[in-house]
Amino acid sequence: MSEIPTRFEHAEEADKIAQAWTDAKCSHADPESSKPPFSVVIPPPNVTGALHLGHGLNNTLQDIVVRRKRMQGFETLWMPGTDHAGIATQAVVERRLKEQEDKTRHDLGREALVDRIWQWKDQYEERIIGQLKRMGTSCDWERLRFTLDPICAAAVRATFFDLFGKRRIYRGKRLVNWDTFLQTAVSDDEVFNETKKGHFYHFRYPVIDPKPGEPEFVTIATTRPETMLGDTAVAVHPDPAAALDAVEAGLREKLSDANEKEAVDLNKQIEALQKRREERLPELIQLRDMAADGRKLMLPLVDREIDLVADEWAKPEMGSGCVKITPAHDPNDYEVGIRQDLPMINILNSDGTLNGEGGQFAGLTIPKARKAVVAALEELGLMGDIEDREIELPHSDRSKTPIEPYLADQWFVAMDELAQSAMDAVSDERVQIFPARYRKGYLDWLSEKRDWPVSRQLWWGHRIPIWSVGGLSQQEANELSSELEKLAERHPDQIAQRIDSDGVDAAGEPTKAVFVCIRSEDETVEADVEALGLQQDPDVLDTWFSSALWPHSTLGWPAQTPELAKFYPTATLITSRDILTLWVARMVLMGLNNVGEVPFSEVFIHPKILDGLGETMSKSKGNGVDPIDVIDKFGPDALRFGLARLATETQDVRMPVQYECPSCEKLIDQTKKNRALPSMDCPACGKPFSTQWAETEADKSLPKAAVVSERFETARNFVNKLWNASRFVMMNLDGFEPTSLDVASLPIEDRWLLSRLSTVTQTVGDAIERYQFGEAARVLYDFAWDEFCSFYVEIAKPRLSDDSQRQIAQNVIAHGLDQLLRLLHPIMPFVTESVWNHLGQIAPKRGVPEPAEVGPFVMTASFPVADESHHDSKIERQFSEFQQIVAAIRQIRASQNIAPKETVPAAIRCSASSQELLQPMTAYFEALAGAEVQSLGPDTTAFETDAHLALPDVDVDVHVDLEKFIDVEAELARLEKLQGQLTGQITGKQNKLSNESFVSRAPADIVQKERESLAGLQTQLEAVAQDILKLQSKK
C-alpha cells in the first residue's frame, strides 16, 4: 500500500488523475455499445476569449449529470467543441488590429484577416480546452468539434441547400440593424439600448405652389436631422379629428380610475389636447386634403420633390402632427414606405459615411453631417427650435457602437413553418424546459415568426453557398438556367437554382438574376458554375445558423454515422437563459427540419453568476473570474462544489469578487472604481500589483493579481475534511478482510449509517434528476461532514481499536466511505478518485452485505442505488435526536469554556418514547460530547448548579452539571440574554394570536401550530427563569 499523504495536494494530483482517465478512455463513447445512450452537447464557448465563472458553472452542472449517468451504466457522450462566433470574434480581432497597428480589415484584405482570426482562434481554443480540462469536465476529447471544421461545414451547406430548395431561404431588400464599425447587419437580439443626451430638431419643408389660404411650410421634428436627405414623404393623419378624439377618450377613461395626483396630470393633458384641437386641427385637416390631391413638398438641400401622404403613422396629438418619412433609415418609416409605395433612398455607405445621395454632404460621417445639415437649414431660414432631450439609442452588442437602420440586400430564412414546429415541440412537451417559467419567453419569441436575416457582411464564418449573376433579360436568364440544368445532371444532388426579379435596366425594362446554391464544398462543381459567369456571394452566415445545427452536425449529419444513430437525439441541454431564443429555439427547429426529431428532450436553464455588485460577470467589465485562478488557489473540487452549491433553480447568484494580492495574498474587494484600474497598491501590505488592464510597461512589470472569490473557502474546507476523514478510515483498515454481514444483527450505529446512506442516495439522485444541484450539494455536505465524518467515524473509533469488533467495523466503515465517494464523485471528481485509489489498495473487495471486487476508477464505478431494506426511520429518528443533544452539550461546554479533557455530568429530560430510542446511545455521549449521562427520561430533573438548553423540536431538555466548571456571572449573562430573546418571541406570538383577522382567516392547523409554539416558548421561559433564580442564590 502506498503512503497516504497528510494533505490532498490538488496541484500535484489533479493532472495525474486526469491523465489516468484519458489513458483508460473513461469518457470515450462507443457507438457500438449495447448500453443505453445518454448524450449531451456542450454549449460551445466562443473563441473570443477565455472562460469565466459563468462557463465554470455551466460546465460543472453538465459534468455532474454526465458523470452520474456514466456511473449508472449509460454509454455517455459529452460532445465538446467551440464556436467560431463570427461577428464577435472578427470584432475582437479588428479592434486589436486597429489599436496595435492602426489598420482596418480592408488594409489587410480578406485572406490575411481570416488568417489572423484563425491564429486567434487557435490560441484561445487551446486556452478554453485547457480550462475545461482543469475543471475536470469528462468530455469525449477525441471528438472535439469546431463550428467551422469540415464536419460542421458539411452540415451547414446541406442545411442551406435544403432550405433553398424548399424556398425557405430567400433574398430580399430589408431594413436591417447596421453596425457601421463592423460593416455588417446584426439581429434584433444583438442590439441593446443606451440613453444618451441629444436634441430634438424642428424644421420646415416648403409646400410647392401653395394655393391661397394653404400653409406655405410643413413643420416636422426629428432627433436625426441628417436623415432628411433620404426623406421621400411627409405624412399627416387621414382623420386627425377622430385620432384626437380617440386620444382624449383614452385619457378620460384613465381619469375615471385615477387618484388625486394622477387626476391633476391627466386633466392637464386633456386641456392641452383641447387646445391643440383648436390650434392645429384645422391645418391638419387642410394638409390631409392636400395629401389627397397629390400635393408635393420640396425637400431642402437636395431640392427633391417629395409626397405629402395620409398615413396613420402620423400622430396629430404630437409635435406639429406631421412626420417625415425616411423609409431606408427608420423601421416605422419603412412600413409607411411599403404601404404608400414610396421610393426608398439609402443615404449611407456601409462605413456610416454619407453616400452620393447625400449631395453636398457626401463623404461626411453621421455626426459631421448632422451639424452640417442643421447649419445649412439655419442658413436657409428653415430651422426652428432645438430642444435638449435624452434619447434611447440602439447599440451593437458586438462593437458597442451606435446602430443605423440600413436598407440592404440580405438572405432570410422564412420562419413561419419552422417556428411553428419548434413551438409545437414545447407545447406538446417533446421538449420540456426547466424551470417551467422560461417556456413563455421561448414561445413568445417564436410566435412572432419574424423571418431570420442570416447573411452577415463579414469575412469570418461560413461563406454563403450561393453563386449569382444579375442584370439579365428573361431570355438570358432562361438560357443560363438551361446550362445549369445540364450541369446539375453532371453533378447530381449538388446544384439548385432559382430565377428572381432583379430590378430594371437603364431603359426601364425588368431584369432577372439567377441564383445557384451548391450543396457540398466541391471545387470542381464551383469552378463549373463560375465558368458560366456566376460569382459567389461575399457574405457569411449568421453564427447562430451553424450553432443551430450543433446537436446533429457534431455527430456527422448529413452522413448517417454510427454516432448519429446511437446518440441523437441527445438527452438534455444545460444552458443560460441569455440564449434560450437565439440558440435553443433554433436548435429545436433545425433538428426537426433536418433529422425529423427534436435535438433533446429536456432543457435546464441555470442561474447567472453576478458579482458582489449584482452585475453580470464579464471580462470586459473586469469582474470576470477565471476558473483557473480559483483552481490555483482552492483546487478544482472546491471550484466545482462551490459552484454546485450555489446553483439554485430560482435566482441568480451573487458572488463577491476580489483581487488577490500577489505579495501578501490578501483579498481586496472589487469596486466599480478599482476593477478598472491598471494597477493599485495593496491596502494590507502596501505593495503595488497590476491587473488585467495593465498596458504600460511600468504596470506590466508589476506582479499580477488574480481575480478570485472567497465563496470557495468553505468548499476547500470540505475537501480537506473529506480527505482527513478518509485518511483516518484507511489508516484504521490494517488487516482488512472482506466479510459477508447480516445487516439485521449489526450494531445500531452501523444500521443507522446504512439507513442514512439509503436516504441520502435517494435524495441526492432525485435532486440531480430535477436539476436541483444546490440541494444535492447541501445534502451531501451535511451528510459527509456532520454525519459520516463528525459522528459515525467518531463512534466507530473504539470498535476499530477493539480486536473483537474491528472486522465488522472495518467492513461497514469501508463500505460507508466507498458509497460516499461514489455519491460525491460527480461533483468532486479529483479528491474522490484519489481516495478511491488508496482505498482500492487496502480494500479492493468491499461492500455490505456482500463484498465485491471494485474497479480501478470511481469514475466508472456504479452510482449508489437506495436500498430500501436498509432504511430504518426509527433509527434515523434516534440518531437525529442524539445528534441534537450532542450539539446542545457541546454548545454548553463551549459557552462555559470547559476543557476538552474534562467529562461533564449530563441529564436528559425526554418523553418515554424518546427514552426508549436514546437508551442504547448513552455510551456514545462520552466519545462525542465528553459527557456522562446520569439520567435519561421523563422524570429527569435539573442539577443544583445547572446549565440548560431546551430542544423544543424534539421535546427534550438537556442539563449539564456545572458544579465544578461554572462561571456564575457568565452563565447568568447567557441566561438573561436568552430570557430576553424568549420574552420577545412570546410577545410576538401573543400579538399574532390576539389579531382577530389572523385567527379567523388563517387555516386552523396554522393557528394551532402558533398556539403550540407559544406554549413551548412559555415553558422554556419558565425553565430559564428557574435556572436564573438558582444561580442568583449562589452569588
From Swiss-Prot:
GO terms assigned for molecular function: aminoacyl-tRNA deacylase activity; ATP binding; valine-tRNA ligase activity
Motif range ('HIGH' region): 45-55
InterPro entries in the record: aa-tRNA-synth_I_CS, aa-tRNA-synth_Ia, Anticodon_Ia_Val, M/V/L/I-tRNA-synth_anticd-bd, Rossmann-like_a/b/a_fold, tRNA-bd_arm, tRNAsynth_Ia_anticodon-bd, Val-tRNA_synth_C_sf
EC number: 6.1.1.9
Protein purpose: Catalyzes the attachment of valine to tRNA(Val). As ValRS can inadvertently accommodate and process structurally similar amino acids such as threonine, to avoid such errors, it has a 'posttransfer' editing activity that hydrolyzes mischarged Thr-tRNA(Val) in a tRNA-dependent manner.
Family affiliation: Belongs to the class-I aminoacyl-tRNA synthetase family. ValS type 1 subfamily.
Domain statement: ValRS has two distinct active sites: one for aminoacylation and one for editing. The misactivated threonine is translocated from the active site to the editing site.
Name recorded for this polypeptide: Valine--tRNA ligase
Organism: Rhodopirellula baltica (strain DSM 10527 / NCIMB 13988 / SH1)
Origin organism lineage: Bacteria, Pseudomonadati, Planctomycetota, Planctomycetia, Pirellulales
